[in-house]
């Protein structure tokens, strides 16, 4: 498939609105507390008939310091002793979850996110993985995708070696920006040398994929400064890159209130940074996967996209499409059978549920057939930039143009604007429309039509 991308400033300005990132459909905004532990247990029981492989997401929320841009659920503390009471509850939740699933189901994907997963000690990392392997069957290294988010300030060569022995074969390194002025403005001082040491250790230990995360739109960023960061990152030659748009939502995320809004780059500068990023990364041979993600052409993500097997979930793009996802730990979200379920958001509530022997689900949603159909359509578009009407009709027993009649006028306008090619066979997102894939997906989002605009979502660019 053609994986090229074109930066069209006029189109971007015309379509630059707020919208979901579609790590799920329906999005978490639609979750309800009417969905609780009983509904989750029922979904797990139904899922056993499929024999699908499992994916485990562990949320380790602790951070030594707060990055002011952060929108994650985290606990900022210098007190490392807080980790053990949390891990004790995670072990108990693993036992509760394990009892819900057939023993023959294999874990093909595992991810530690945060927070800062490496906040915990090496002994605690060992114990967590030992417990996981005791309770669940993990696929061999050649098959399994076992990843961890790394703060290079919180890891060294010994930590990296341990993680590889524990079975991790992928890591993402948080960088955001190497400019010291920007780092000071967001309270994340991190040298290039710290990042390079961890990256080189990961390569030496045989990690199969190393990703670097950047953010554009942070205070005091400039085109020239971010280009210097890009040049340095390209020298590191990671397998993947994520370049996220900073969403300044201080009314929702308290740490962001410590950012001086007057120091944020104006919209035009953000767009210039984005254009520079696209030009530099694609010029260096990286493929635009979609939704802020780039990969080397021989990386598994790029190959899966070429082969039509790429998938997207709460962990981002994935090559493991057919897994039931178990969310472990505070605020984690899982996807089991035709449901999404989210754990308690506060440590106190999470601990109380676990101590009482309850699965700590406090909200979620059971998808209707329409939800599942629309999720399939959105996933096909967001992963492959192509939608074959006949394939959707065969899979769901519908007549596409009749079922989605309300979407056709909006699609027609997008065709006129050069975002997509629309004909009787389907939709093909053109190079000018790839940066705006969220806009194309929003056409098929039944929930947005019931709202006064996509409230609470970040800008698409």
Where are these regions (language model features)?
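C-terminal scaffold of the Radical SAM
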Residues: 46, 53, 76-100, 106-401, ...
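Short, cationic-aromatic polyanion-contact patches
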Residues: 182, 306, 428-444
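Basic amphipathic alpha-helical segments that dock to polyanions
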Residues: 392, 409-417
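A short, conserved structural fragment
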Residues: 415-425
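Short, amphipathic alpha-helical interaction segments positioned at domain boundaries
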Residues: 434-461
């Amino acid at each position: 498939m053609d994986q090229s991308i074109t930066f069209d400033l006029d189109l971007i300005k015309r379509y630059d609105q707020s919208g979901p990132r579609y790590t799920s459909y329906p999005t978490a905004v639609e979750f309800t507390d009417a969905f609780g532990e009983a509904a989750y247990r029922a979904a797990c029981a139904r899922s056993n008939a499929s024999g699908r492989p499992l994916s485990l997401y562990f949320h380790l929320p602790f951070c030594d310091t707060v990055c002011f841009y952060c929108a994650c659920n985290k606990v900022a503390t210098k007190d490392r002793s807080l980790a053990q009471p949390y891990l004790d509850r995670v072990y108990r939740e693993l036992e509760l979850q394990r009892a819900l699933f057939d023993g023959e189901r294999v874990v093909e994907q595992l991810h530690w996110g945060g927070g800062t997963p490496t906040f915990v000690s090496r002994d605690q990392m060992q114990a967590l993985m030992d417990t996981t392997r005791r309770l669940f069957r993990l696929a061999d290294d050649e098959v399994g995708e076992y990843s961890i988010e790394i703060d290079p300030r919180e890891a060294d060569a010994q930590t990296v070696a341990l993680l590889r022995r524990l079975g991790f074969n992928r890591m993402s390194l948080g960088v955001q920006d190497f400019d010291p002025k920007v780092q000071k403005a967001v309270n994340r001082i991190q040298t290039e040398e710290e990042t390079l040491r961890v990256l080189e250790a990961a390569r030496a230990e045989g990690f199969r994929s190393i990703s670097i995360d950047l953010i554009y739109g942070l205070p005091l960023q400039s085109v020239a400064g971010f280009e210097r960061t890009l040049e340095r990152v390209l020298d590191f030659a990671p397998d993947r890159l994520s370049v996220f748009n900073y969403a300044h939502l201080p009314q929702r995320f308290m740490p962001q209130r410590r950012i001086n809004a007057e120091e944020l780059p104006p919209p035009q500068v953000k767009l210039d940074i984005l254009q520079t990023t696209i030009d530099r990364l694609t010029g260096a041979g990286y493929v635009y996967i979609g939704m802020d993600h780039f990969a080397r052409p021989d990386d598994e993500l790029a190959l899966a996209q070429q082969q039509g097997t790429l998938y997207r979930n709460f962990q981002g793009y994935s090559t493991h499409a057919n897994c039931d996802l178990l969310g472990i730990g505070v605020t984690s979200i899982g996807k089991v059978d035709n449901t999404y379920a989210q754990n308690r958001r506060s440590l106190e509530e999470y601990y109380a549920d676990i101590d009482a022997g309850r699965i700590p689900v406090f909200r979620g949603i059971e998808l209707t057939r329409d939800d599942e159909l629309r999720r399939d359509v959105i996933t096909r578009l967001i992963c492959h930039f192509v939608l074959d009407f006949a394939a959707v009709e065969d899979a769901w027993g519908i007549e596409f143009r009749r079922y989605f009649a309300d979407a056709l006028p909006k699609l027609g306008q997008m065709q006129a604007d050069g975002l997509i090619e629309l004909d009787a066979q389907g939709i093909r997102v053109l190079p000018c429309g790839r940066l705006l894939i969220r806009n194309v997906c929003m056409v098929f989002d039944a929930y947005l039509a019931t709202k006064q605009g996509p409230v609470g979502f970040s800008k698409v660019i």
